[in-house]
């Protein structure tokens, strides 16, 4: 006996007739359910028997699948609206108290924790929550979004802090041995590409094709990837650099944290202290032209580039860049690539690519 409100549906063995006024038989209950909920109508009443029960189960299954489809469609529509309104495309913002943004950082990103959480839930429905503990904690804001509580002092990522990642201002090259060796072996080709797109950096207006407006006086960049998007015209002009990027195993190329390109700093130029958007990435600097007097300070630790060699930096730490050389020394030029932090697992990378995917 099935009770619904104050009515009883009495299931008879063969006839399925109404027992008393106000009671439903199996046929009437199924007919009411079909008329009220299903987008596809079936002829009713049906003769009771194995075929009728099969059709009833089919109708209930159709109703369940239709409900799941509607729920998923509404959720994805909400995500799309939030993405356009919140500016998910482009590089997430950096620390509000810092200076100019770094290579490729456009200052755009999800403006609210709710949007990131909704995207993560959409990912889990499509795939799984397995291995998502740290990402889930970050998305819920416990340690994670916009720096979060517990990220103190010199490490303050502007958007996403993934908890429990080993961190230090400079990362050993062995942590990304394959990609470091590939980039260093590609040094001659990448240097030739820079020579093909270089100019006198005299502040000409408009800028030569492919070059972005200066981040600060004396600081220029030409990007092959910006915020997870390939820049086809620049890639065609730099075939050696593009070929090297395609061979990397840990290149962060599919989300808004990922950039790659040439960074030029003129003598006397300086980028004041700032923090990158996340600790889930490591920036690889390949030195191309390094005159005297150039310095990179990350988390209070000074370092200098070397031509033909890579330097791995966790730019979620507060860092400054300066070229203290003379005008005769020429510009400092490095090729910068954003790589995944080596301790971010494959499942976490896939989830972050989904959550922070650039808009089409």
Swiss-Prot record:
GO CC terms of this entry: membrane
EC annotation from Swiss-Prot or TrEMBL: 1.14.11.-
Membrane topology summary: Single-pass type II membrane protein
Chief location: membrane
Cytoplasmic topological intervals: 1-45
Top-level EC class as recorded in UniProt: oxidoreductase
UniProt keyword annotations, A-Z: Dioxygenase, Membrane, Oxidoreductase, Signal-anchor, Transmembrane, Transmembrane helix
Pfam families attached to this UniProt entry: Asp_Arg_Hydrox
Single GO molecular function: dioxygenase activity
TM spans (from-to): 46-68
Keyword Transmembrane listed: yes
Residue numbers on the Lumenal membrane side: 69-360
Domain of life: Eukaryota
Subcellular location: Membrane
Family, per entry: Belongs to the aspartyl/asparaginyl beta-hydroxylase family.
The protein's name in its UniProt record: Aspartate beta-hydroxylase domain-containing protein 1
Organism for this UniProt entry: Mus musculus (Mouse)
């Amino acid at each position: 006996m099935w009770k619904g409100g104050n009515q009883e549906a009495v299931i008879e063995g063969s006839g399925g007739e109404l027992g008393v006024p106000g009671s439903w038989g199996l046929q009437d209950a199924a007919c009411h359910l079909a008329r009220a909920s299903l987008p596809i109508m079936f002829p009713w009443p049906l003769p009771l028997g194995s075929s009728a029960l099969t059709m009833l189960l089919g109708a209930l299954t159709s109703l369940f699948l239709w409900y799941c489809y509607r729920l998923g469609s509404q959720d994805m529509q909400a995500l799309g609206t939030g993405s356009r309104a919140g500016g998910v495309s482009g590089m997430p913002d950096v620390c509000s108290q810092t200076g100019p943004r770094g290579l490729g950082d456009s200052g755009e990103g999800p403006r609210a924790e709710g949007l990131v959480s909704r995207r993560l839930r959409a990912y889990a429905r499509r795939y799984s929550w397995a291995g998502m503990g740290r990402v889930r904690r970050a998305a819920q804001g416990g340690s994670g979004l916009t720096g979060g509580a517990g990220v103190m002092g010199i490490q303050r990522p502007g958007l996403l802090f993934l908890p429990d990642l080993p961190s230090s201002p400079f990362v050993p090259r062995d942590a990304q041995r394959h990609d470091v060796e590939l980039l260093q072996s590609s040094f001659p080709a990448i240097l030739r590409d820079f020579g093909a797109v270089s100019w006198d950096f005299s502040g000409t207006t408009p800028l030569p094709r492919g070059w972005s407006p200066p981040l600060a006086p004396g600081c220029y960049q030409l990007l092959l990837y910006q915020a997870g998007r390939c820049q086809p015209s620049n890639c065609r002009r730099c075939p050696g650099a593009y070929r090297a990027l395609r061979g990397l195993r840990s290149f962060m190329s599919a989300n808004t944290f990922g950039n790659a390109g040439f960074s030029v700093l003129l003598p006397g130029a300086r980028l004041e202290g700032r923090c990158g958007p996340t600790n889930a990435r490591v920036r690889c600097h390949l030195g191309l032209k390094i005159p005297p007097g150039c310095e990179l300070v990350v988390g209070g630790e000074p370092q200098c580039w070397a031509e033909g060699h890579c330097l791995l930096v966790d730019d979620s730490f507060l860092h400054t860049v300066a070229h203290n050389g003379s005008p005769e020394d020429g510009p400092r030029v490095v090729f910068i690539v954003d790589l995944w932090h080596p301790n971010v697992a494959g499942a976490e990378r896939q989830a972050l690519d989904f959550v922070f995917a650039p808009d089409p």
